[in-house]
Amino acid sequence: MPQLLVTVKISKGFKTWTEMAKSMEEKAGSEGAKVIWAATNPDETSVYVMMDVPNPEFMQTFGLREDVKKAREEAGADVSSTTVITQIGDYWLGD
């Protein structure tokens, strides 16, 4: 399963974004995706997310679904700013 490192601009802070992301876990999981970790920059205007996804196109096929897009926008995500930084080959989360 591919992993992606993705970023998106946010306007309502990290807590609001994470609440939305948690509410999407079941929907995303039913399509084979899972957030591995998420972090924000110091001023909470961008989120960086590492995800397991069923295929590299997942951000387009799932992330732009009308119901998902609406939830993301309501949580302050600038959906049009969503950018796949890179596909991840291997990673280490530390001890």
Predicted regions, residues:
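Short S/T/G/P-rich N-terminal loop/turn motif that feeds into the first structured element of a domain
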Residues: M1-K69, E74-D95
